[in-house]
């Protein structure tokens, strides 16, 4: 059995590289989900599918935005911070909207809640 000493800098670089890879994969996922969302919304008109795609795509976009922030924050920290905050808030807002529509598609509300 061998023992290998790994410095904390090497671990930090590996974790950063892993998150950049995850961010890239989430950016591709967000793009694909957005394209499929538009087809489901306009052509298929399937509320369950487009709500799920909106929720997944917007959550994946927030991961991609944070990974992008990590890459550009050295250029202009203030602008990068403002952009990532605006993007993440918008992403979570879109995810909440998609989750609300998904809940209504799976469990349609009654027309008159006071009827019982």
Task: Indicate where each model-derived feature is located.
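Hydrophobic, aromatic-enriched alpha-helical segments typical of multi-pass transmembrane helices
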Residues: 2-116
